[in-house]
Regions:
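Membrane-embedded alpha-helical bundles that constitute the cytochrome b-like, heme-associated redox core
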Residues: 2-273
Length: 273
């Protein structure tokens, strides 16, 4: 170091010879802890809610709406959904909630997402808790060891997320029916589903892996004008990846909650026509 001194080692933070020789864990005077605390609270709230709904195995279908947590329904014990996404692929041996089957894929996509990794690394593991704030861990291995090395399968979860988004789009189209499965109708739930699927697609396509797949390997953009234009569009979405991550997380929970309220008889779906 320029001062010829070594940093003072203590029990907090990863300390190496490249760090400033200060004894304080950080010099920030703002409320740096607020962002990771709010992030942790928001993620924890969603985890609690989604766990309850996934294992409830009830009140997830109110014609013509099916909860995004249960779509597609791949077990024999699914509620009958006329022309809906109830495809009996797992048979009768699957005895618990069918939501557990499908939620693996959207949750896997979000858990390995670059933004969510930053969010829960900071919010739950404090690794690091904030910029210019030393983390409390003595060692750092990054994502080179199990289980964090599994984060590298994010690109494959992206393809699964595309399939799930396609199925949810199908569910949204079915939402233009009434409770008697007649087409040409629209209710408040239809608007809820439209908002949700728009945010789901925006979040999915704003993914860093999507941006790389579209234009990351191109050496000459001039030779691929269509992919270059798509790469630019996705880049604009990518700049809002954090906002879209939270907005879509809230929207999918609200869509499920709306179906729950209608299916459990709290109120009837208001119909516009």
């Amino acid at each position: 170091m320029a001062t010829g001194t070594e940093p003072h080692l203590n029990s907090g933070g990863v300390r190496t010879g490249t760090r400033a020789a200060i004894t304080a864990p950080h010099l920030r005077t703002d409320r740096w802890w607020l962002a990771p605390a709010v992030t942790a609270a928001g993620l924890l709230a969603f985890i609690v809610y989604s766990t309850w709904r996934a294992f409830a195995n009830a009140d997830y279908y109110a014609a013509p709406y099916v909860s995004p947590f249960y779509s597609p329904c791949l077990a024999e014990n699914c509620e009958t959904m006329r022309a809906g996404p109830n495809w009996d692929l797992f048979g009768s041996w699957w005895g618990i909630s069918p939501a557990i089957i499908i939620l693996i894929f959207p949750l896997g996509f979000r858990l390995t997402c670059y933004y969510y990794r930053k969010a829960y690394y900071r919010g739950f593991w404090m690794s690091p808790p904030a910029c210019a704030v030393a983390e409390p861990h003595k060692k750092y291995s990054g994502e080179t060891r199990f289980p964090l090395i599994l984060q590298n399968i994010h690109r494959y979860f992206f393809y699964a997320a595309l399939l799930v988004a396609g199925i949810l789009t199908y569910d949204t189209v079915l939402a233009f029916r009434d409770e008697n499965y007649e087409w040409g109708h629209m209710g408040l739930g239809t608007l809820v589903f439209l908002a949700n699927i728009a945010l789901i697609w925006a979040y999915t396509l704003s993914c860093h892996s999507c941006r790389h797949i579209v234009g990351g390997k191109l050496k000459h953009f001039s030779k691929h004008p269509v992919r270059y234009r798509m790469w630019q569009w996705i880049g604009k979405l990518n700049a809002r990846h954090m906002q879209l991550a939270w907005a879509s997380l809230v929207s999918v929970a609200l869509a499920d909650f709306y179906v729950y309220l209608v299916a459990s008889g709290v109120f009837d779906d208001p119909r516009f026509f």
